[in-house]
């Protein structure tokens, strides 16, 4: 099994850093999982968010998504399926599953 990296993103800033970090980890053969929560769910609507598709398992906090007024716009977020709009339990699973866990 490949080494894995979990990334918790809670800020709607620095998407470029998240993309670069994810690309670097993927290039090194790491399995990457990213959970977006709080204001970070806004990043799902940024054009560069699509650069993460295929490089990581992407999940968004459904509660944060709704709290930010995005309910009904789930299909606009690339690479994130219905089941990937999850609760903080998904974040807890990610932290338990991954060899390394970063908070941004």
Model features per residue range: what roles?
Residues 4-16, 38-42:
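Short, glycine-rich nucleotide/cofactor-binding loops
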Residues 4, 27-33, 57:
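Residues at the starts of beta-strands that form the adenosine-phosphate
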Residues 26, 52-53, 96:
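Anion (oxyanion) recognition and catalysis
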Residues 14-28, 34:
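Histidine-anchored nucleotide/phosphate-binding helix
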Residues 45-48, 90:
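Short acidic active-site motifs
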Residues 75-104:
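C-terminal structural segments of small proteins and small subunits
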């Amino acid at each position: 099994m490949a080494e894995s990296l979990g990334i918790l993103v809670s800020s709607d800033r620095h998407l470029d850093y998240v993309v670069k970090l994810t690309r670097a980890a993927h290039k090194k053969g790491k399995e990457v999982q990213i959970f977006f929560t709080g204001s970070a769910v806004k990043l799902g609507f940024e054009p560069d968010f699509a650069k993460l598709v295929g490089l990581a398992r992407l999940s968004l906090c459904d509660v944060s998504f709704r709290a930010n007024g995005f309910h009904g716009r789930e299909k606009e977020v690339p690479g994130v399926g219905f089941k990937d709009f999850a609760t903080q339990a998904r974040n807890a699973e990610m932290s338990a599953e991954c060899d390394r866990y970063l908070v941004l």
